Amino acid sequence: MRARTLLAAGPMLAAVLVTGCSTTDAGTPISGSTGASTAPGGSTPRSEVDLASTDPCTMLTETEAQQVGVPSPGVRDDVAGFLSCDWQLSARDDPEFDTGMLVSVSIDPERGIEELNLSGAVRITPTTVGSHQGQLVAESGGFGGPGTCQVDLVISPSSHVTVSALTGIDTERACDVATRAAASVEPKLP
């Protein structure tokens, strides 16, 4: 029963973890870099990538998804104006996760991380992943209780990408999964 609840909650979790409002939030905003850099494996400057037309399901390859513990391909699940993709592992597939596991990549081309509503978060820690500054948010409050963690990466002052994980009740494991997934996503970002 808990596994079905977790899997059904995936789209709602993605929306709650990345939904922002106009209130002042806990944490320190971190400004991003505006300089151009070269995309991995190509010569197109990453700053020229149109974030709004990016498919979030291309952010984790099959190998990368397997390395963080979720099957591929991801399932596109745009929620509340965010471009989002979910990768799920059911409890049947891995008995270590009695409630399953969910990893989401959500792209918000119109709001920066300072606009996220993180009131109720247990821990907000500034972080850097590759060349992107951001924040690690443990138990982001609201629907994101124990067993949830997200890494918000600054793309610009008005855009960000959130990589989130839900692992049942183990928040530290969720933060480990979200951090490893963010490290795979980051080189593909502008």
Positions of PLM-derived features:
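A short, solvent-exposed beta-edge/loop patch
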Residues: 123-190
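Bacterial N-terminal signal peptides that target proteins for export
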Residues: 1-11
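Extracytoplasmic low-complexity, Pro/Thr/Ser/Ala/Gly-rich segments
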Residues: 28-99
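C-terminal motif of bacterial Sec signal peptides marking the signal peptidase cleavage site
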Residues: 16-20
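A short, structure-level motif marking secondary-structure boundaries and short turns
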Residues: 2-3, 45-48, 109, 166
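Bacterial signal peptide processing site
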Residues: 22-25
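Short, solvent-exposed recognition patches
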Residues: 71-137
